């Protein structure tokens, strides 16, 4: 058998459910909360989501239930966007719930994300197949994709395929853009009088899909534990050799939740938080000044080494660079024909010629390799209009600018230390890992709970599990209307409904804890070494939650 010993042992793990979800479906009673409103742009969203806007928050409690179904279910499931640890356990939870409801129920997985739905490319997920993927990482059971469902033709195809397969519901496992797809599909089906339900599941290691009810998206726990182990290893390496500065870029397209969590777990000398950069309107030069200041002070202490954490999406939060990217984007969108068939050097000439004088200065002040990568990030925007920020090696940009600054200082006799930088990018290493105990339990519960929402006839909801700082048996299950998370944003020159990314709250406990400690972490070697994710052993270690959740849910 082509399977590791670890996988064999890990598949023996039985995920834990909230007590309410262990009950017979007829004894799970639905409780309606107050009707909801969107974050902003409420009138525009009311017009767009005429049938699904303003739904109430849902919770479940023990009591008599009036289920919407009595016969076997046919459910379609989609894995959308980048992988996150635990996706297979969401599917396992869905499978076990529908089979418990009626053993003749069927679960279909659409291959390659939303495109599989549009092309009716699917497989039936059988018990033997599901069992081989329980508690494993990745999205490879059916694979994922980033196709955006956004045209009338797409909606019609999705509806046709759903009816062709006699689907009662579709569950979309994904991030903000994927759950935007879910909200739009739910509205379209409802508008056309079709009784096909759509439920979303909050997935993203970035942790930017959340609100007061969605406490965290799945995958964040596992991924940050993996990155923190690696960063802790680099901290130990820095202490061992005392000659390297490790610059670590961490995945996280927009929000800095991953960087902040890893900083709280490892105590690096420097960690940039993108949201603070934006709030304080820091320039690129000011960020370099701050980093050089720490490097200089540590050098005076005899410490010519350290660890720096940089969030992947930082480049979009530096006001001058963000404005530059938007202007480059606008130039490309309005003059796309001029760029066809050109190499990158020729493209650069057109961009430079059309940039405003100020932005031209900003652009040309950047190292040449960054100038080219910015162009590539614009050319490679995903179907949702997001820049490919991972193309921009921000950590290398910082290294080059710091090196240049230190060389100048050395010539003036202001710096006598040594600076040997090493760059790293941690992202893909954590996306498809075996899920932690937390993510294994959380994901299984999210999937199981999604079925309970379906059995109660709900659509346009996101599966929600709360009180995540407690034992899984004490978690609270329910649902949050997808429209509650939305606003209107400009994509490719048009205002469109989109789930708003939840950024780091600069008034929140995690950031304040970081601010309280960062100055002493900068100059002292107070590194923590979290070690690898633990799957076996005492509950204190294997069931540990993130520092972010500990602080945010502190009573």
UniProtKB/Swiss-Prot annotation:
Does the keyword Transcription regulation belong to this entry? no
Q: Which Gene3D superfamilies match?
A: 3.40.50.450, Phosphofructokinase domain, Phosphofructokinase, domain 3
Share an example GO biological-process annotation for this protein: response to glucose
The record's subcellular location field reads: Cytoplasm
Write the record's keywords in alphabetical order, separated by commas.
Cytoplasm, Glycolysis, Kinase, Magnesium, Metal-binding, Transferase
Q: Which domain of life is it from?
A: Bacteria
Return the annotated site residues (Important for catalytic activity and substrate specificity): 177
EC main class here is transferase
Active-site feature positions:
206 (proton acceptor)
Show which residues form the site (Important for catalytic activity).
Answer: 203
Per the entry, which co-factors are needed?
Mg(2+)
Query: In which residues is substrate bound?
Result: 146, 204-206, 243-244, 251-253, 312, 428-431
Provide the E.C. number(s) assigned to this enzyme.
2.7.1.90
Q: What is its pathway? A: Carbohydrate degradation; glycolysis; D-glyceraldehyde 3-phosphate and glycerone phosphate from D-glucose: step 3/4
Give the UniProt entry's GO cellular component terms: cytosol
Report which reactions are catalysed by this protein.
beta-D-fructose 6-phosphate + diphosphate = beta-D-fructose 1,6-bisphosphate + phosphate + H(+)
Instruction: Indicate yes or no for the key word Membrane.
Output: no
Q: Which InterPro entries match?
A: ATP_PFK, PfpB_PPi_PFK, Phosphofructokinase_dom, PKF_sf
Task: Describe regulators of its activity.
Answer: Non-allosteric.
Residues binding Mg(2+), per UniProt: 176
Q: Which GO terms describe its molecular function?
A: 6-phosphofructokinase activity; ATP binding; diphosphate-fructose-6-phosphate 1-phosphotransferase activity; metal ion binding
* Pfam families the UniProt entry points to: PFK
Q: How does activity depend on pH?
A: Optimum pH is 6.4-7.2.
Family statement: Belongs to the phosphofructokinase type A (PFKA) family. PPi-dependent PFK group II subfamily. Clade 'Long' sub-subfamily.
Assembly notes = Homodimer.
Q: What name has this protein been given in UniProt?
A: Pyrophosphate--fructose 6-phosphate 1-phosphotransferase
Source organism (scientific name): Borreliella burgdorferi (strain ATCC 35210 / DSM 4680 / CIP 102532 / B31) (Borrelia burgdorferi)
């Amino acid at each position: 058998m082509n399977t590791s010993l670890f996988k064999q042992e890990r598949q023996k793990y039985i995920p834990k459910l909230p007590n309410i979800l262990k009950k017979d479906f007829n004894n799970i009673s639905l409780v309606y909360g107050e009707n909801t409103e969107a974050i902003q742009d409420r009138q525009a969203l009311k017009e767009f989501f005429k049938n699904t806007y303003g739904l109430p928050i849902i919770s479940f409690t023990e009591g008599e239930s009036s289920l919407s179904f009595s016969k076997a279910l046919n459910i379609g499931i989609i894995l959308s966007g980048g992988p996150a640890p635990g996706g297979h356990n969401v599917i396992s939870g869905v499978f076990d719930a529908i089979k418990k409801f009626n053993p003749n129920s069927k679960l279909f997985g659409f291959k390659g994300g939303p495109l599989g739905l549009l092309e009716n490319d699917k497989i039936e997920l059988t018990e033997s197949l599901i069992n081989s993927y329980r508690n494993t990482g990745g999205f490879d059971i059916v694979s994922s994709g980033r196709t955006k469902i956004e045209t009338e033709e797409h909606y019609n195809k999705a509806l046709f395929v759903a009816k062709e397969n006699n689907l009662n519901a579709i569950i979309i496992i994904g991030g903000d853009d994927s759950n935007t797809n879910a909200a739009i599909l739910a509205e379209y089906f409802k508008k056309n009088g079709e009784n096909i339900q759509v439920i979303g599941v909050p997935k993203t290691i970035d942790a930017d899909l959340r609100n007061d009810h969605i406490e965290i998206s799945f995958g964040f726990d596992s991924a940050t534990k993996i990155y923190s182990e690696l960063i802790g290893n680099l901290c130990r390496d820095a202490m061992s050799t005392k000659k390297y500065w490790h610059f670590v870029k961490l995945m996280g397209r927009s929000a800095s939740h991953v960087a902040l969590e890893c900083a709280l777990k490892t105590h690096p000398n420097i960690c940039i938080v993108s949201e603070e950069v934006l709030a304080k309107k820091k320039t690129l030069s000011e960020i370099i000044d701050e980093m050089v200041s720490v490097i200089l002070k540590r050098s005076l202490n005899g410490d010519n080494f350290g660890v720096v954490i940089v969030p992947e999406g930082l480049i979009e939060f530096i006001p001058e660079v963000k404005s530059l990217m938007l202007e480059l984007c606008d130039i490309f969108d309005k003059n796309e024909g001029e760029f066809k068939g050109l190499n990158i050097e020729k493209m650069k000439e057109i961009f430079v010629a059309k940039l405003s004088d100020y932005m031209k200065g900003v652009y040309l002040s950047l190292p040449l390799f960054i100038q080219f990568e910015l162009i590539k990030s614009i050319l490679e925007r995903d179907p949702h209009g997001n820049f490919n920020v991972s193309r921009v090696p921000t950590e290398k940009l910082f290294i080059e600018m710091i090196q240049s600054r230190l060389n100048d200082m050395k010539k003036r006799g202001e710096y006598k230390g040594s600076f040997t930088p090493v760059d790293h990018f941690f992202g893909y290493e954590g996306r498809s890992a075996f899920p932690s105990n937390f993510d294994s339990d959380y994901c299984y519960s999210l999937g199981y709970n999604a079925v309970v929402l379906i059995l109660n006839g709900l659509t346009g909801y996101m599966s929600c599990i709360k009180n995540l700082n407690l034992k899984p048996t004490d978690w609270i299950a329910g649902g949050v209307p997808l429209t509650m998370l939305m606003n209107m944003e400009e994509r490719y020159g048009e205002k469109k409904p989109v789930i708003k990314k939840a950024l780091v709250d600069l008034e929140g406990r995690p950031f304040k804890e970081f601010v309280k400690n960062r100055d002493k972490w900068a100059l002292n070697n107070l590194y923590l070494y979290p070690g690898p994710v633990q799957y076996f052993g005492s509950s204190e270690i294997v069931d540990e939650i993130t520092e972010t959740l500990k602080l945010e849910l502190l009573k």
